[in-house]
Amino acid sequence: MDSTELRKVFKMFDKNGDGRITKKELGESFKNFGIFIPDDELDATMDKIDANGDGCVDVEEFGLLYRSILGDDAAGRAPRTAAAAIGGEGGAPDDEDEGMREAFNVFDQNGDGFITVDELRSVLSSLGLKHGRTADDCRRMISMVDADGDGRVDFKEFKQMMRGGGFAALGG
């Protein structure tokens, strides 16, 4: 992933645009995914991500986290990610779609275009979160967004979820 793409994903978390993700912003971002994290767990996650200990996550720290989630193939995924963001429709996507595509790709670890129970569980676990560690938790979260009932989330379902306020909003 290049620095432009990383910054687009970062901006989805950096709600006030000051270049730093606070604990509150991180918590709000997780809520958009339908993930409600207790304060103590959010503190532990911030401690894990906040390498310099200033209480906020900057874009460099976020990049380290992002690469650790994607694993060793992060560099190899960048061209496929950019092509996927364009979607083969000839025109450049708008920034919102591109940012959502990058966020989607954090969860779609194998790059097949779907977020599975195992992928969701893996990402939540690498963030140090207890919520979503069981397959049943992840299955429930996915079922709230899975419009076509195939047991996984595609990009269209992900965009609908994000625009509708996260997993929780679609869960009724």
Curated annotation (Swiss-Prot):
Disulfide bonds: none annotated. Ca(2+) 2 binds at D50, N52, D54, C56, E61. Ca(2+) 4 binds at D146, D148, D150, R152, E157. The keyword Metal-binding applies. Gene3D superfamilies: EF-hand (1.10.238.10). It holds the Pfam family EF-hand_7. Keywords: Calcium, Metal-binding, Repeat. Ca(2+) 3 binds at D108, N110, D112, E119. Ca(2+) 1 binds at D14, N16, D18, R20, E25. Residues 1-36, 37-72, 95-130, 133-168 form the EF-hand domain. PROSITE patterns: EF_HAND_1 (PS00018), EF_HAND_2 (PS50222). Signal peptide: none annotated. The keyword Manganese does not apply. Coiled coil: none annotated. Potential calcium sensor. This is Probable calcium-binding protein CML28. It comes from Oryza sativa subsp. japonica (Rice). The gene is CML28.
